[in-house]
Amino acid sequence: MAEQTEAPTTEESVLVITRVFDAPRELVWKAWTDPESVMRWWGPKGYTSPACQIDLRVGGKYLWCMRSPEGQEYWSTGVYREIVEPERIVCTNSFADADGNPVPASHYGIPEDFPGETLSTLTLEEREGKTELTLRTEDLPAGEAHESANAGWNEAFDKLADHLSQA
């Protein structure tokens, strides 16, 4: 099971979540970089992930989909800016359509103050056979967008912990 080691940072426009997973770093890396693995955990509780494309190289893109229990699909895309295997990924994040074209958050009924693009840095550090994951998302306004992203990521990380325990 994953444990949250720090409260999320509430600094204006930055969300930082740190979790420790009972799995080796290489396995956590694979969970983020292998499409079949991503589809096993991506999305909040109750959501599934029916599609995932990853072009894991600097300048490459990803296109991930999560589906709500009601059947609504939410697509996200981004560009990889930095990759240091198995330690760090820096990428942009945007809502998208099924073809990978960025769309505003309002396309999915999300308040318009949600930014068109954020920047995320994923860091994985080994800790005595476990992995400390830190996700830092920049350009995310304080308030509802910040709280919603925090809740969604933490639910996804709970699912990631379950996936890693079965891997």
Where in this protein do the model-derived segments appear?
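Hydrophobic ligand-binding cavity/cleft-lining segments
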Residues: 1-48
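Short beta-edge strand/loop motif at the mouth of beta-sheet-based domains
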Residues: 16, 36-79
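Hydrophobic/aromatic beta-strand elements that line small-molecule binding cavities or substrate pockets
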Residues: 19, 51-52, 76-82, 117-125
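Beta-strand/loop substructures that line and gate deep hydrophobic ligand-binding cavities in soluble
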Residues: 90-94, 100-154
